[in-house]
From Swiss-Prot:
Keyword Hydrolase part of the UniProt annotation: no
Pfam family, one: Dala_Dala_lig_N
EC number: 6.3.2.4
Binding site for ATP: 185-240
Pathway named in the protein's UniProt entry: Cell wall biogenesis; peptidoglycan biosynthesis
Cofactor binding annotation: Binds 2 magnesium or manganese ions per subunit.
Domain ATP-grasp: 149-358
Binding site for Mg(2+) 1: 311, 325
Protein species of origin: Trichodesmium erythraeum (strain IMS101)
Keywords, ordered alphabetically: ATP-binding, Cell shape, Cell wall biogenesis/degradation, Cytoplasm, Ligase, Magnesium, Manganese, Metal-binding, Nucleotide-binding, Peptidoglycan synthesis
PROSITE patterns, per the entry: ATP_GRASP, DALA_DALA_LIGASE_1, DALA_DALA_LIGASE_2
Subcellular location: Cytoplasm
Gene assigned in the entry: ddl
Gene3D superfamilies from the UniProt entry: 3.40.50.20, ATP-grasp fold, A domain, ATP-grasp fold, B domain
Entry protein name: D-alanine--D-alanine ligase
Length: 366
């Protein structure tokens, strides 16, 4: 049987570069398991933090290394290798390794800007090769918090109160800014969260409890993005549900996250011992069933495909279930919620990876 060549695309320019490498290592291992190694051949392609795509031999070294950042530093100083990749081009960042032409299906385990925002998906679509995950539209909507919320509103999914802010409202007119802050205080009250609309890794996000903190947070967020979203804070359980499929997606059991930090930021997410995962979530069957239903609705609302993790708030005092966000390319590390939820739902990791590849092939064939 001819093996399918899987291009594992990892690394990238975002703040979640290291998480991507960790996820790629686990996926690469899954592709070598007994049930997969007869079907798939791995072609790893590593994208450095500076955007340079590396050939598969060096990319495999990154996957095998316990200290990939040291390998990257060495390789950035390797003039001969980088020169050979450019093939006399004025911009090495536009060069794709020759092994990419051999790929039958891509698995882009990339996060954040230029990874899960539709840009890499557009490139892969131009290659006319199947790829795991959402397409250009679903990825872009899943990354942009404002577009995402508009889609959720249109689908009738309840959310926390929010207000959209632009950089020009913050920086261009000193008379407008105080009125803007007044409106936020009146509409959302404290505490509230200030977030750049189109960044991952919790970059630029702040929880604010006063006027001075609000002003500082808005100014900081505007330095990252020209569009900002401010959300009302809510005291609630934080629940997550994994979704798998294309046009008829299915939802996993529901998980719950607890932590001691001020909010679920990057450090809390990815530092061992900072957060506790409860699978299944400590909620009633009725609440879990409703969340699973809402998760698939959210998946379809943004035109996602393949996979997504959907996050919720459950306000126990009122019984409200509020959708928070969708992540169209969640982490695949050993401590990531997405694969753990499917494992608990009866789909082991190796089977999950196989299913995602098959879903990519199915979507491409239609």
């Amino acid at each position: 049987m001819t093996k399918l060549r899987v291009g594992l695309l990892f690394g990238g320019c975002s703040g979640e570069h290291e998480v991507s490498i960790r996820s790629a290592k686990v996926i690469a291992t899954a592709l070598t398991k007994v049930q997969n190694k007869e079907k798939y051949e791995l072609i790893p392609i590593y994208i450095q933090k500076n955007g340079l795509w590396q050939p598969s031999d060096f990319s495999q070294k990154v996957l095998n290394s316990d200290h990939p950042s040291l390998l990257q530093l060495t390789n950035e100083n390797n003039h001969d290798l980088n020169t050979s990749l450019t093939q006399q081009s004025s911009s090495p960042l536009w060069q794709i390794p020759p092994q990419a032409a051999q790929v039958d299906v891509w698995f882009p385990i990339l996060h954040g800007p230029n990874g899960e925002d539709g840009t890499i998906q557009g490139l892969l679509k131009l290659m006319q090769v199947p790829f795991v995950g959402s397409g250009v539209l679903g990825s872009a909507m899943g990354m942009d918090k404002i577009a995402m919320k508009i889609a959720f509103d249109h689908a009738g999914l309840p959310q926390v109160k929010y207000q959209v802010v632009t950089r020009s409202q913050i920086w261009s007119n000193s008379c407008v800014f105080p009125k803007l802050c007044d409106d936020i205080e009146t509409t959302l009250e404290y505490p509230c969260f200030v977030k750049p609309a189109n960044l991952g890794s919790s970059v630029g996000i702040a929880k604010v409890r006063s006027r001075s903190e609000l002003e500082t947070a808005l100014d900081n967020a505007a330095s990252y993005d020209r569009r900002i979203i401010v959300e009302a804070g809510v005291e609630a359980k934080e629940l997550e549900c994994a979704v798998l499929g294309n046009d008829m997606p299915k939802a996993s059991i529901v998980g719950e996250i607890t932590y001691n930090s001020d909010f679920y930021d990057y450090e809390t997410k990815y530092t061992e011992g900072k957060a506790d995962l409860h699978i299944p979530a400590r909620v009633s069957e009725a609440i879990a069933t409703k969340i699973k239903e809402m998760a698939t609705q959210a998946f379809l609302a943004v035109d996602a495909a393949g996979l997504a993790r959907v996050d919720f708030f459950y306000v126990e005092k009122t019984g409200e279930i509020l959708i928070n966000e969708i992540n169209t390319m969640p982490g695949f590390t050993s401590s990531s919620m997405y694969p753990m939820l499917w494992e608990a739902s009866g789909i082991p990791f190796s089977e999950l990876v196989d299913t995602l590849i098959q879903l990519a092939l199915e979507r491409h064939s239609k």
